[in-house]
């Protein structure tokens, strides 16, 4: 009930804001301290800035990205403000924002309370990482090992192992894999088909979660796919086949099918890994509800991003010279792939409810 009240208060307040720089959102924690730290892996939905420090064209460390982040800073987050890990960390009473592990200025406190290893543009499929020059999940696991070593230097081996085992671990990836290798280019589709590619990705998810477990993580939430067919970029790609901008049913059906398989796989993994709590995090439901019932959330545009035309703008195509919409809070998406901050708030609150359900 508290979660729904928070959503209502945020959305009601934000209706009075009409410009990108007019507001900064702070979600107050609910005085819950279930976890000593938060550790984050995956892609641009949760990358808080690691790509700033690697050689890749997949970056968001320039305006108008971050125009609603505290200080109106473009931190490398692919949205107009904060992301899922920031809001969850805040709601859980861990900290207000989750820094990227590659930030050279991390404090001991930053390390102790957790960091982000995610890399925008990455996926479970190595083809995705090679296409975008980003950090694969294997490299992210290596970064976790480096993190544990640094944490041990600060608090000692025993305390470090305790922090890692009790930390909330969030994994969010896969969308880039399906977009790049299944729908937009035929590389994997021709060889494996949809069902075969889903099995391939699930195998890679299994291997990655196993690796996290072997390093010491025990409380792991793996997020499923969003309604991929409702992403503006996918609607744009499909315009040659359909004359209107609307969600692509087949791609959404594929997402739902994959998510059910993922949920089943994670349940099986938990039963085989002693002392683990490995569970599925649903983001499909919240995003699809916003896409199909926008009035509930004060949204007026769900098929285009706020940046530029909202149909093709992403990364360097969404820049300081690009026109942006007057009120991002009325848009489900910030650019042609990534949700707006208001959407991330709704998704994060939904995930917090799921975390409480599983772990409380």
From Swiss-Prot:
User: Cellular component per GO?
Assistant: extracellular region
Q: Name one GO biological process term.
A: lipid catabolic process
Q: Which Pfam families match?
A: Lipase_GDSL
One Gene Ontology term of the molecular function aspect:
hydrolase activity, acting on ester bonds
Q: Which InterPro entries match?
A: GDSL (IPR001087), GDSL_lipolytic_enzyme (IPR050592), SGNH_hydro_sf (IPR036514), SGNH_plant_lipase-like (IPR035669)
Q: Does the keyword Nuclease apply?
A: no
What is this enzyme's EC? 3.1.1.-
Locations listed in the record: Secreted
Q: What start and end residues bound the annotated signal peptide? A: 1-22
Catalytic residue positions: 44, 335, 338
Q: Which UniProt keywords apply?
A: Glycoprotein, Hydrolase, Lipid degradation, Lipid metabolism, Secreted, Signal
Residues modified by glycosylation: 26, 31, 73, 126, 272
Q: What class of enzyme is it?
A: hydrolase
Listed Gene3D superfamilies:
SGNH hydrolase
Coiled coil (UniProt feature) = none
Q: Family assignment?
A: Belongs to the 'GDSL' lipolytic enzyme family.
**What's the protein called, per UniProt?**
GDSL esterase/lipase At1g06990
């Amino acid at each position: 009930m508290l979660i729904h009240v928070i959503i209502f208060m945020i959305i009601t307040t934000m209706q009075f804001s009409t410009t990108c720089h007019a507001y900064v959102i702070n979600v107050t924690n609910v005085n819950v301290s279930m976890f000593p730290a938060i550790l984050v892996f995956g892609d641009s939905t949760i990358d808080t800035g690691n790509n700033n420090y690697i050689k890749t064209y997949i970056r968001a460390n320039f305006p108008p990205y971050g125009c609603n982040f505290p200080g109106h800073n473009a931190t490398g987050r692919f949205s107009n403000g904060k992301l899922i890990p920031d809001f969850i960390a805040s709601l859980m009473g861990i900290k207000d924002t989750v820094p990227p592990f590659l930030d050279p200025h991390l404090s001991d406190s930053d390390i102790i309370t957790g960091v982000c290893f995610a890399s925008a543009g990455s996926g479970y499929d190595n083809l995705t990482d090679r296409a975008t020059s980003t950090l694969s999940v294997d490299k992210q696991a290596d970064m976790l090992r480096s993190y544990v070593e640094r944490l041990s230097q600060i608090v000692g081996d025993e305390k470090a192992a305790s922090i890692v085992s009790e930390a909330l671990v969030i994994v969010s990836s896969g969308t880039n894999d399906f977009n790049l290798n299944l729908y937009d280019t035929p590389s994997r589709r021709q060889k494996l088909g949809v069902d075969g590619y889903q099995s391939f990705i699930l195998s890679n998810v299994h291997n990655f979660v196993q690796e996290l477990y072997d390093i010491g993580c025990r409380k792991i939430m793996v997020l499923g796919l969003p309604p991929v067919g409702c992403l503006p970029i996918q609607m744009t790609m499909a315009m040659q086949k359909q004359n209107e901008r609307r969600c692509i049913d087949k791609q959404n059906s594929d997402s739902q099918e994959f998510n059910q398989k993922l949920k089943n796989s994670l349940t099986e993994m938990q039963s085989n890994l002693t002392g683990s709590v490995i569970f599925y995090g649903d983001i499909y439901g919240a995003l699809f509800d916003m896409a199909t019932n926008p009035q509930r959330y004060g949204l007026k545009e769900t098929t285009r991003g706020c940046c530029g035309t909202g149909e093709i703008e992403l990364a360097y195509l969404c820049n300081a010279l690009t026109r942006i919409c007057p009120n991002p809070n009325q848009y489900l998406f910030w650019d042609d792939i990534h949700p707006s901050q208001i959407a991330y708030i709704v998704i994060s609150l939904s995930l917090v409810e799921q975390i409480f359900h599983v772990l409380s």
